[in-house]
Every structure is written in structure tokens, then in C-alpha cells.
Amino acid sequence: VLVPPQPIAVVHFLGGAFVGTAPNVAYRWLLTELGKAGYVVVATPFLNTFDHTAIARTVLNRFESIIERLQRNQEITSGFLPVYGLGHSMGCKLHLLIGSLYGVERAGNILIAYNNYPVKQAIPFGEQFAQLQLDKWLMGLQKQLKQFNWQVDLSFEFTPSPEETNQLIAGHYDIRRNLLIKFSNDEIDQTLSLRPILNQQAADLVTYCPLPGNHLTPLGQEIQWETGTEFSPLDAVGQWLKSSLSQDLQRLQSEILRWLDPSHFYPAAKINSAPSH
């Protein structure tokens, strides 16, 4: 949790599937910059399972508990502060489920590199992994069922499935203002399939923002590269890498802040760090 002394809004952050357990570490630079700009940042960790509906409910409960604690401890006022959702990859899907299923009030959602693939594509060898996890249990069950000529469906999918997720968003998603960010070098991004679904509800409030970078750009940190006493070819490569990665990350940060506050006024602030519970 990052709390500036005079917060202007709250940002609830949810990360990707395999880094969502430690968002404060994986996304440290980006989240810290949001805190410096005056935003309370609540980064909610989660363990990935096939039941995305349950994860969405859990992270929402955790977020609401943290906000209540901050208000109780007077770290933030109990008055109105707008709340924004910020998600990366699977975190986007979770925010979309929260906005579709649980009637939350949000000033808007920022969805970075949205991913809604089925198990087989979202997780390398996902189908085989799921099969192996249940093989021992199913082996005995299948033997028993065979004598009754019953069959067992060994296909596994997220809950809700990609198709069910799209239907939920189309029919029940209640957050009208959205920023969709897609990176130029991201082969698993599905922002373009999400965009028309959201446009059906409030096209004038859906902002599409293509940016240079790849699926891992939000995880980047500013690279500190010190050259030696003599400038070498390795130093040249290091400086180029630092410049390229830093520019993509800083551009992402700038677009997020511009959308959050179009007036371009971002107050500098010291932030207090506290672990989320």
C-alpha cells in the first residue's frame, strides 16, 4: 500500500497471472510513480487458479478491507475519493469481472495488455498440466465408471471461460470510462477484441492507446548503467538498452497519469509504504 499525504484518488492494482503474487515487487517502479503523483495505490496479490470468479471476489474483499483499515487509521479520509482499477494482463480480466459481477463504483478502469485466452493458450502446456494434476484421482474413477459406460470430460477451462467472460462484459459491465493500452510487440494481447465490446456501451468514454513495448513492459524498472573509465562497446549497448526500456516504461506512466488527470498536474509527494494484508 502506498499512501501520499494528500491523496487525490485511489488506484486498485492487479497484476498478471504469474507475478500477481508479488505486485509490489514486480511493478515497483510504476506503482511508486503513481504514489508520487498523489494516488493511494493498493496492489492486491493473488494466487492464480482456474476459478477467476473466485479470485475476483477475493481480491475485491481484500481491497475493501484495506480501504476500511486506512480510513479507520485516518491514513486516508472517510470522504469521497474516486477509485480507479488498474490491471495488467490477467489483472484486466479480474477488474472486468469485478465490474460485471459485484456492482462496484469506479471512476474508471485502466486495462493494460488485456489477456483472455483459454487455458491451452494462456498457460504453456496448461491442458497437460491440468491433466497431470488429476490423473491419479481420475484413473481410479474412470475404471469405476467404465463398467457403467459413462465417460469423463477431461477438458479444463477457466471459470468463466473466455466466451462467458465476453458475454458478462457485454451484458453487465458497469464501468463506462476505460483506458485500453496495447503494446506494439505483444503477441498475446487481446485488447482489440475487447475494444468493440466496451464501445457498445460507451464508445465516447473508451480511450484506445497503442504504445511501443511488449507484454512485460509494465514490469520494467529503471536501469542504472554506469560506464567505466573508458567508454566500451558494452557500455554503448547498455546505454541503448537503458534508454529504450526506460522510454517505453516512462511513456506508459505518462499516458496513465494523463488519462487519470488530463490537467497534467501531478503533485510531488512523499509516500508511506505499508504491507498489504
What name fits each language-model region?
Residues 1-48:
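Short, surface-exposed "cap/lid" segments of acyl-processing enzymes
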Residues 12, 42, 84-86, 108-110, ...:
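Hydrophobic/aromatic beta-strand patches that form the interior of the parallel beta-sheet core
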Residues 17-20, 49, 91-92, 116-119, ...:
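Short acidic, S/G/P-rich loop/turn micro-motifs used as interaction or catalytic elements
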Residues 22-26, 51-59, 248:
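Phosphate/oxyanion-binding active-site loops and adjacent basic polyanion-contact surfaces
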Residues 31-37, 61, 100-105, 198-200:
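Short, surface-exposed basic-aromatic patches at helix termini and helix-loop junctions that form
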Residues 50-79:
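Alpha/beta-hydrolase active-site loop
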Residues 76-163, 170-171:
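Primarily recognizes the serine-hydrolase "nucleophile elbow" in alpha/beta-hydrolase
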Residues 135, 139-142, 156-277:
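C-terminal catalytic-base region of ester-bond hydrolases, centering on the histidine
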